[in-house]
């Protein structure tokens, strides 16, 4: 059998499909999710049901979002799952997750995310952080390292700062390429993202936060003084607790937010 065909379905490159087929890993992921009846569970990209089936054995109803028409059809006719699933056929990147929220029942989102869209998809989900209890995702290991990174490390970047702005990040388990059909060329890992009830460092303007973070990491080897020249004077940076001689890659989330909030307040005053 060809190594890109699994359970009679050929993996589609344009959808970034790699199907999980290692029972030990699947068991570890389902244990991490810990699904319970009555919870508002949403799976992104169920594929051939490697995680969907064991989750379905634990709960009576849940929602899946699948872009691949053939796979969505397969789930509609699944002997065990068909009666339990609400299937949304379409692109999770454009999906309004608010429509799935129920009173006092936040979303628990999980999935083996296509690696080619995982970062923009997470940014899309962060917009719904108030409606999400937690998220469990299989991602490229390098992306999980970035999500969990600390200031001054090579992996620390825009994704780190914005993920940690919204969520507590907990790496759960590492997954080798051999756990998939076809095997990807990279190692994978599962991460748990838990949105904060109250943001630890709230920004008064997400536009300003996004701007200072982007500009900082686009010029990560410059000093903070040079990176934000024209936005903030060195004296202002020092007042905010930021050393103008350090590099942006060494700034903490709290420092990025302090700078963004100062810029927001200053521009509102001058508006």
UniProtKB/Swiss-Prot annotation:
S-adenosyl-L-methionine binds at residues 18, 20, 45, 66, 91, 112. It comes from the Bacteria. Its EC number is 2.1.1.182. One of its GO terms (biological process) is rRNA methylation. Coiled coil: none annotated. The keyword Cell membrane does not apply. It catalyses: adenosine(1518)/adenosine(1519) in 16S rRNA + 4 S-adenosyl-L-methionine = N(6)-dimethyladenosine(1518)/N(6)-dimethyladenosine(1519) in 16S rRNA + 4 S-adenosyl-L-homocysteine + 4 H(+). InterPro entries: KsgA/Erm, rRNA_Ade_diMease-like_C, rRNA_Ade_Mease_Trfase_CS, rRNA_Ade_methylase_Trfase_N, rRNA_adenine_dimethylase, SAM-dependent_MTases_sf. One of its GO terms (molecular function) is RNA binding. Keywords: Cytoplasm, Methyltransferase, RNA-binding, rRNA processing, S-adenosyl-L-methionine, Transferase. Its main location: cytoplasm. PROSITE patterns: RRNA_A_DIMETH, SAM_RNA_A_N6_MT. GO terms for cellular component: cytosol. SMART domains: rADc (SM00650). The keyword Protease does not apply. It is found in: Cytoplasm. Specifically dimethylates two adjacent adenosines (A1518 and A1519) in the loop of a conserved hairpin near the 3'-end of 16S rRNA in the 30S particle. May play a critical role in biogenesis of 30S subunits. Belongs to the class I-like SAM-binding methyltransferase superfamily. rRNA adenine N(6)-methyltransferase family. RsmA subfamily. This is Ribosomal RNA small subunit methyltransferase A. It comes from Vibrio cholerae serotype O1 (strain ATCC 39315 / El Tor Inaba N16961).
